[in-house]
UniProtKB/Swiss-Prot annotation:
Organism lineage string: Bacteria, Pseudomonadati, Pseudomonadota, Gammaproteobacteria, Enterobacterales
Name of the featured protein: Large ribosomal subunit protein bL34
Similarity comment text for this entry: Belongs to the bacterial ribosomal protein bL34 family.
The species this protein was found in: Buchnera aphidicola subsp. Baizongia pistaciae (strain Bp)
Keyword Ribonucleoprotein appears in the UniProt entry: yes
Pfam families: Ribosomal_L34
Amino acid sequence: MKRTFQPSTLKRNRSHGFRARMSTKNGRHILSRRRSKFRTRLTVSSN
C-alpha cells in the first residue's frame, strides 16, 4: 500500500511557503501570530 505522505518541496512551498502566506489576508494573520510568538521559522520555506 502506498503511503499518504509523498514529500515534494515544490508543492510544500506553494501551499505553505512565505509567498503563499503573504498572498492572502489570513495568511498574513498567520505570519503575524507566529512573529508575536517569536517563532524562529515563520513558514516551511524560510528554514
